[in-house]
Structures are given as structure tokens and as C-alpha cells.
Amino acid sequence: MLQVFDIIGPIMIGPSESITAGAVRIXKI
């Protein structure tokens, strides 16, 4: 999971909404 966040971190660098959307995507996976 840490690796996934490490990749999404730099890509989803933005507002909290973007980070939340990324978290939801991880949950979907």
C-alpha cells in the first residue's frame, strides 16, 4: 500500500479533493 501511495502521492499532488479521489480509487482497487 505504501508503494501505491508513493506513486499516487506525486501524481495526485494537489488539493485535498484530489487526494480523497485517489484514496477512493485505491479502495475501489
From Swiss-Prot:
Q: What is its EC number?
A: 4.3.1.17
Which cofactors go with this protein?
[4Fe-4S] cluster
UniProt GO MF annotations? 4 iron, 4 sulfur cluster binding; L-serine ammonia-lyase activity; metal ion binding
Pathway of action: Carbohydrate biosynthesis; gluconeogenesis
This enzyme catalyses: L-serine = pyruvate + NH4(+)
UniProt keyword terms in alphabetical order: 4Fe-4S, Gluconeogenesis, Iron, Iron-sulfur, Lyase, Metal-binding
Membrane-crossing ranges are none
Please verify whether the record's keywords include rRNA processing.
Answer: no
What the record says about family reads:
Belongs to the iron-sulfur dependent L-serine dehydratase family.
Describe its partners and assembly state.
Heterodimer of an alpha chain and a beta chain.
* Protein name as catalogued: L-serine dehydratase, beta chain
Identify the species of origin. Answer: Anaerotignum propionicum (Clostridium propionicum)
